[in-house]
Amino acid sequence: MTINASNIENSFSKINSHFSKLTDYIWPIKRHEISKFLFITLLMFCILFIQNLIRALKDSIVTTMIGAETISFLKFWGVMPSAFLITVIYVKLVNRMKAENIFYLIISIFLTFFALFAYVIFPNHEMLHLRPVTVHNLTASLPNLKWFILLLSKWSFSLFYIIAELWPNVVFALLFWQFVNNITTVEESKRFYPLFGLLSQTGIYLAGHFLENLSNINYYVTNKFALQSSFHTLSIQIILTIVLILGIVSIKTFWLLNHKVLDKKHMALLRFKTKNKSITIAKSFQMILSSRHIRLIATLLICYGIAINLVEGPWKAAATKIYKTPTEYAAFIGSYLSYTGVFTIFFVLLGSNIVRRMGWFTSAVITPSIVFITGILFFAVNNFEGFAGLIIANFILTDPALVAITIGAIQNVLSKSSKYTLFDSTKEMAYVPLEPEIKISGKAAADVIGTKLGKSGSAFLQSLIFIILPSASYQSISICLMIIFILTCVTWIWATKELNKEYKNSIKFSQK
């Protein structure tokens, strides 16, 4: 039997070809792009790690040291106006400073505040805040302003919450993505961005794992250096020290990207410019009212924001029954973040196959279905803790309150994971068959109105209830929130079904 050398050569070339395709699929980064990709990834990792640490810390401080009910007030009356203010400031900075210097300035302001909070403000918060007797007298004389008084009396905690909430919008969404979008070509983005998504979830998982082990780290540092500071003060200082270190690494990485990694071609693209034809709130409403397709997409965004916030408030309030200190609460949030990272990676890997095999509607309806089913389970146990919680607890031999917290955590993990993948991808797909003008302005309109109304609408609704009923708590209004939640989810599923019809019609129309 003779062996043909040309056949062997062809076989090897086919194997090499298949192996090359597999390698390109797993690692699509070209050799000359590796340094650029790795530095951008490092910058993204640092920013997201900080984001997840301060997100957990702000909730830990506010829920355990002021009250979970105040979060809705902070979101509507604190975060929203601050976001508008910083947008105005940013626009003015863009017209007066270099893009690189804007990044350094804004990051430095955030890091300076975090350093002051860790080493000056929090260790002395009892001296800086109003005395409990004064707060009690004020709330007794002005009961309808109770929650505003509590927030102002513990002003440093409120300020920390607002600053921490601004980080993802200002540093990640604005500074990071505007920089990356400017230095990345369209061809590069197709290969870079999917990997960014996977790596960002790795950051969530690691941040969560760090917070889970915060108590152990605290004990180690205390024993190693014979520190005398309070346990919870040290926990906050450990978290914010990591934040400061990663912040400095971010600044250095950004400097290296600008001065060592990027070539002149990429640097020529790097300009932060404000668009003269930015869409206003009034124009957004006009666009939504004129197009049913865009109106339905905006409805999905509004319903998501309302539904998630309606569950998060009572869930965080329930968690404070078990996790009563900032350290304990941060460890609990860390566990939740770890699972969110794992499940999001799972949905990322599964998402494209679901869309391809089962179609747009099935993929789009998964998120509202998950939110609805898990949300109803949470409210059922939370509202009827003595009945439903006791039945479940008898089977799994645990505290009924812990059952509600666990179901709430599962609800949040699955909801956020499916939102980051299936919901976001199907929402973006819904724009594709539209005419170019509607696609561009319609997306801006839906994102502006849908996102803002979803987040702020739920916060305003909850804060209004607490103003009218100052003695109310999340536990006492939970049934009311459950009814609103059910109506919101039903509307969400209906809007998804109707958008599916519009989506199919738009595809048919675009193919004519």
From Swiss-Prot:
A GO CC annotation given for this chain: plasma membrane
DNA repair keyword on record: no
GO molecular function, one term: ATP binding
Predominant localisation class: membrane
Membrane topology, as annotated: Multi-pass membrane protein
Sequence intervals crossing the membrane: 34-54, 71-91, 102-122, 157-177, 192-212, 231-251, 296-316, 330-350, 361-381, 390-410, 476-496
Record keywords: ATP-binding, Cell membrane, Membrane, Nucleotide-binding, Transmembrane, Transmembrane helix, Transport
Annotated protein name in UniProt: ADP,ATP carrier protein 4
